[in-house]
Amino acid sequence: MKNAKRTLALLLALVMSLSLLAGCGNQDNTSGGATTDETPLVVGYSPFSSKFSPFFSETAYDQDVYAMTQLGLLTSDRTGAIIYKGIEGETVNYNGTDYTYYGPADLEVVENADGTVDYNFTLREDLKFSDGEPLTVDDVIFSMYVLCDPTYEGNSTLYAQPIVGMAEYRAGMTTLSKALAAAGRDNTDFTNWTEEQQTKFWDNFDKGLVPFAQEICDYVVSAGAAAETDSVAAKASQWGFTLADDATVEDFAMAIGEQYGWIFSAMEAETAGSALSDLMDADVYNDYPVMGVKTGESADSITGIKKIDDYHMTVTMTKVDAVAIYQLGISIAPMHYYGNKDLYDYDNNSFGFPKGDLSSVRAKTTQPMGAGPYKFIKFENGTVYFEANENYFQGAPKTKYVNFLECISDDDKLNGVTTGTIDITDPSMSSDTADAIATANSNGELTGDKVTTDLVNNLGYGYIGMNSVVMSVGGEPSSQASKDLRKAFGTILSVYRDVAIDSYYGERASVINYPISDTSWAAPRPSDDGYKVAFSTDVNGNDIYTSDMSAEDKYAAAKTAALGYLEAAGYTVADGKVTAAPEGAKMEYEVWIPADGKGDHPSFM
């Protein structure tokens, strides 16, 4: 029923797209004439959300903004491999060329006899933030404690790594919204919160989250996915929620809250129209999900994060974890800016902010600062302004000024380049985009006097998602019959991938068979043992296709295989047609294709 964000299972990887990077062909097409040190580099960007925080950013575009200002504890080479000797630098060959990489720290990894692992960091001693303040281990520790705070709700998962003492530190504390929801509206113990706070929470639940859930039920009915007389559970199932048969709309609202850890802003993803923020009081919506409440005993510090001196520290993990090292490469945020230096006393377990209170960090969400190559100046009238950081450890960038300019659409990005108001941007590549670029250039090519293009592999892929609750037999998503139903659809949809992608992208994209971009080193290859084309076997495990089949032969073979899956799922199949559905399944399912609301999608054939 819902858009791709609500899919419960990956069906298949449709396409590994190619992105376009477009820039001015020559200086005559820039907006400012002759280039000088004062001329900014203008980059066309998709819209921002103003969460430019190394801790709380959400969109990739906001992350790019803060990344301009930040310095990561670790750096990597062009293949993603970690650089362990960042201070002296490491030289690594890539495609026949040697590249030397520098970073703010050296890292030594020691596997101990007891199974624990020490990550020993040594920082450069000349690092400074963009405001001139020195960067030390204290800033690293502050940043780690923010990411590991019990009330932290950002995208980092450092707190989930097997760091010694992490569980003990995060125990005994939760957020006010979680605690109130767990206690229930009839709670009479006001040790950890006031009666007024509890009353306000449930008042907002009734006037905000319950109508929010009811609107979803109403939408499902209006869309024809359920009848008005159907139960709340039946309506909620169309939205991906499994509830008891006798569930009320209040139960549905509770399920939404629990799904998102009682973070109201995150619940907005479930909207059927209204913004939850418009239905609730601002303080409950914004503050309750991030306000720490002590519920029991907890450790005062994370024993596995140890300061040795101002430039040396060790992080100890309980076991070897291949991906943990990547989680340690955090942005080193300035404690004096995001926290409070007066509240930092390592020896007395104080780390720059009160445990359970990240308000000082959140207050700087829209104005990032760090030790990265650029300083954030302002975000004004749709433009983010940066200036080179004179204190950057590798020297100030040669391009003194950089502007990120918001563009509403890909057309805006392309028009900006052709008119000279944008120097470089990344519109999504399609045949229409390619035609527009060729038309702009006098030579009719993708690179010419107006626009220079550079096609790069996109580290991503498209896919079709199927809601396993909706597409099930007998209300049992995990049953074999339900799986066979979904495999029938997967078999039919997958066989048309080649023609869909070829007609829309041409040579600019390729079909993949596993949910991982072909640009990744971990992507399966056709030469690997066990490699299979997606949905290429029938219900008995036999291959559907042969190498000499024409496209039409493949379509016919896929149809036969799909009918076999449907029959196994309990459907009635006669003379190559499906005539009846089993109980708890349907003869018709709805497919949603976003396509920017104008059919701009390879699935529109």
Predicted regions and their residues:
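Append "and occasionally in soluble cytosolic enzymes with long acidic Gly/Pro-rich linkers
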Residues: 377, 385-387, 481-605
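Bacterial signal peptide processing site
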Residues: 25-27
